[in-house]
């Protein structure tokens, strides 16, 4: 009797794993299609799922990615001038060399993000979270909404440019 129950439970578990794998693949296809629509010119992607998508080397000015899930996305060397990211999850994002002039990053989660060498002229960072974010070489000198409390958990280097009166701890060498 117990053996039959155990076999039934194992079979259900195997079916569940197969369903999860299919769902994961379907989600991956959906995320890639959403990213492609953005690249092709779609402006609004409010609260969309862009987990782990590759948007590197793209010109995505004026896009509305408010509330989007960009966790682990590759945004390296892309341009997001006048884009809206308010409330987005940008944790563990690769934002190397990203340009975002006049963009809105209000309430964005940048935990563990690599924002090395980015340019954020005139962008807003009210209530953004920078836990363990690397801002080395980035220019935030004309950004607004940054506070010392926000930056206390991030790091940078001698090339990082911040608004007057704000400082960053140096990043630890790997």
Question: Where do the protein language model's features map onto the residues?
Answer:
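Positively charged n-region of N-terminal signal peptides that target proteins for export
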Residues: 1-5
């Amino acid at each position: 009797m117990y053996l039959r129950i155990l076999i039934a439970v194992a079979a259900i578990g195997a079916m569940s794993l197969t369903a999860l794998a299919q769902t994961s693949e379907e989600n991956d296809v959906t995320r890639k299609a959403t990213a492609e629509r953005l690249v092709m010119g779609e402006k609004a992607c409010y609260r969309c799922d862009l987990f782990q998508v590759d948007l590197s080397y793209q010109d995505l000015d004026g896009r509305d990615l408010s509330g989007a899930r960009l966790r682990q996305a590759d945004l390296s060397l892309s341009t997001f001038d006048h884009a809206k990211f308010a409330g987005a999850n940008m944790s563990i994002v690769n934002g190397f060399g990203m340009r975002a002039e006049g963009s809105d990053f209000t309430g964005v989660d940048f935990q563990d993000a690599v924002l090395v060498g980015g340019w954020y002229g005139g962008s807003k960072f009210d209530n953004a979270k920078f836990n363990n974010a690397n801002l080395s070489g980035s220019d935030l000198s004309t950004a607004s909404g940054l506070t010392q409390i926000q930056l206390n958990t991030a790091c940078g280097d001698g090339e990082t440019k911040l608004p007057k009166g704000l400082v960053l701890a140096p990043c630890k060498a790997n």
